[in-house]
Structures are given as C-alpha cells and as structure tokens.
Amino acid sequence: ALVSLEDELAALHGKERALTFTSGYVANEASLSALVAQLPDVLILSDEMNHASIISGIKLSRAEKAIFRHNDVANLEELLAAQPNDRPKIIVFESVYSMDGDTSPIAEIAALARRYSALTYLDEVHAVGMYGAEGGGIAQMRGLEDGIDIIQGTLGKAFGASGGYIAA
C-alpha cells in the first residue's frame, strides 16, 4: 500500500518517484539534509520567507547557504551569478507562503535554475490538494512541474490525512 501511495504521489506531480515521511516538516528536514550529503560543496539558496521546517533542514545539512529577498528574482540571480557555474546549487522556495499567502514566481525561478545549472526544491504544502487540475499544486496549475526537480508536499492539509512526501 505504501509503494502504491508513493507511485500515486509521483504521478500527481509528473515525477519518477516519491518518498513518504511522517509529516511535511520531517520531509523538509530529512530531504534537505540528506540531499546535501550527496552534493559536496553545494550552496543552498533559500527564500527569506521559507518555513521553519526548511530552515531547520538547511541548518541540519551544515551546507553553505545564501538567503535571497522574498520572491526577488533579481536578487536571486545576483547570488547565482556570483557562483561558479559548475558548483552544485539548490534553490529552495515555496509555492504559497504560509505567513502571507503570496505565491512565488515559479517560472522565473525555474528559468534561473536552468541558466545557472541549479536544482530546484519547491515546497507545495500549502497548495497540494487545492490548486491544479489534479490537486498537484501551483506548479501543476501553471504547467511548470517539468521545470522543478523536487516537489515537497503534505497529506496533512487539503488531503485530510497525515504524512509528508517529496517527489522527484
């Protein structure tokens, strides 16, 4: 049953695989800290309004981080341009921010990621089940899932269950 759920979550986001966790919070902490272990010298670029679970995952990773101004694509580009193109980079941001409800410029961030050879990690916990033709979130609603490398979600809000996941 668990594998079936993971397969359904991967399909929901148009990704190859998904991995479930006990909560969305744990999904962010575990995924970000584990991902960094696979990418030596990685730089994490994090939106200044990211959720506490993302901040915790970044701290646990002990990776170098750079914080960009909230939804400020120009500031993000300045930070990316200052890095060697071959340095591993992960842009971590949310689709819908919990504190004020605004949405991120996903298309623009994904375009910068491609231009500067960075991975994208999009937290969709406040969007899954609410947006998109199948409830896949803002990236699905805007037709942008292919431009996102890792999507993080939760079952504990709109889906009315418990658990969190990543899909990649």
Language model region names:
Residues 1-23:
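Conserved N-terminal alpha-helix of the aminotransferase class I/II PLP-enzyme fold
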Residues 19-25, 48, 152-155:
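Active-site nucleophile and cofactor-binding loops and adjacent substrate-binding regions
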Residues 33-52:
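Conserved PLP-anchoring active-site segment centered on the Schiff-base-forming lysine
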Residues 52, 99, 122, 128-129:
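Catalytic P-loop NTPase motifs of RecA-like helicase/translocase cores
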Residues 60-62, 116, 147:
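Short, structured coil segments at secondary-structure junctions
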Residues 66, 70-122:
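Active-site phosphate-binding strand-loop segment of PLP-dependent enzymes
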Residues 134, 140-168:
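Active-site PLP attachment segment
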